[in-house]
Amino acid sequence: MKTVSIIGGTGYTGSELLRLLSNHDNVEVLNVTSRKEAGKKLTDFHPQVRNLRNYNDLEFQNIAPEDIDTDIVFCATPHGASMAIVPILHEKGINVIDLSGDYRFEDIEMYESWYGLKHTGIIESAVYGLPELHREKIKKSKTIANPGCYPTGAILSMAPLVANDLVDERIIFDSKSGVSGAGVVASQTTHFPNVNENLGAYKITNHRHSPEIGKELDYLGNKKLKVSFTPHLLPVTRGILTTAHSYLKEDVSRADVIEIYEEFYKDEFFVRIFEEGMVSLTGVRGTNFCDIGGFEIDQHGRIVVISAIDNLVKGASGQAIQNMNIIMGFDEKEGLSVGGMRP
């Protein structure tokens, strides 16, 4: 039995890690940290996991990273905080999955420009943890940068077309997310009266996930692409629906495109290709699946592909556990084999 610590256990990603790890047969959570809630019972703060595993016996702790000695650490801290923690764990030889944006960029200047932070804890061996593209690298690394929620759905929606050089350099992603993507701390943006019965775009051309999507697709296509991304906030709790647009470089049919996607993802349990019907948020709610469908081509050669993920699972904590399973040599599906909550 491998041991786990969760640094930053009061947010939504920490909560989801606890929920999902309660179904994992090969790990036990020993430490959940929180400076603010230190000394309080875990299940008083997270009553949804009461009576699961050893959670009734756990209290939040304020532990310095130097004093953590578990096999795996999930770092569920805000951007900027992880860079002070992860290098210490890295030096101790602990397997770390960081859910912040601090280690997603090989180009540190790009990170500093988009996040407005000076990076003080660079780890050159950190690997971008999108298993469908980087599984072999993940297996060999002890520091994994868990992808962002929007980039996960966006990259997976277009990866087969980019890898096969079937679309031109212009790719547009239109994503709509549930409110939980904004985090556990309430704001005017996420206040119920402002979100309910409403829909709006934000950070229309300058969301920090834009360069993350772009650099991964650039790598996959081995060329510089012109990636545009605009997010919207939906009046729902969970889920991201991404509509991807580009223009085909060749005269291929919808059937050809579907065949390309099925071949590209044939060994990927967590990617489901829908030839017919629409992918939906309810279909992936609570799951680690990315559902991909659409594949429609208009009279101008524009192809539209649609993906759906749960932003807190495949877009965060579920993918983090998937990465843990890979680096620890567990079955990749362990703790994650659950279907969507539909309706």
Curated annotation (Swiss-Prot):
Source superkingdom: Archaea
EC nos: 1.2.1.38
Transmembrane segments: none
Keywords per UniProt: Amino-acid biosynthesis, Arginine biosynthesis, Cytoplasm, NADP, Oxidoreductase
Matching Gene3D superfamilies: Dihydrodipicolinate Reductase, domain 2 (3.30.360.10), NAD(P)-binding Rossmann-like Domain (3.40.50.720)
SUPFAM superfamilies linked to this entry: Glyceraldehyde-3-phosphate dehydrogenase-like, C-terminal domain (SSF55347), NAD(P)-binding Rossmann-fold domains (SSF51735)
Protein localization: Cytoplasm
Sample GO molecular function, one term: NADP+ binding
Active site per the UniProt annotation: C149
Catalysed reaction equations from the record: N-acetyl-L-glutamate 5-semialdehyde + phosphate + NADP(+) = N-acetyl-L-glutamyl 5-phosphate + NADPH + H(+)
Keyword Cytoplasm carried by entry: yes
Gene Ontology biological process terms from the UniProt entry: L-arginine biosynthetic process
HAMAP family membership: ArgC_type1 (MF_00150)
NCBIfam families registered for this protein in UniProt: argC
Chain's role: Catalyzes the NADPH-dependent reduction of N-acetyl-5-glutamyl phosphate to yield N-acetyl-L-glutamate 5-semialdehyde.
UniProt protein name: N-acetyl-gamma-glutamyl-phosphate reductase
Species name: Methanococcus maripaludis (strain C6 / ATCC BAA-1332)
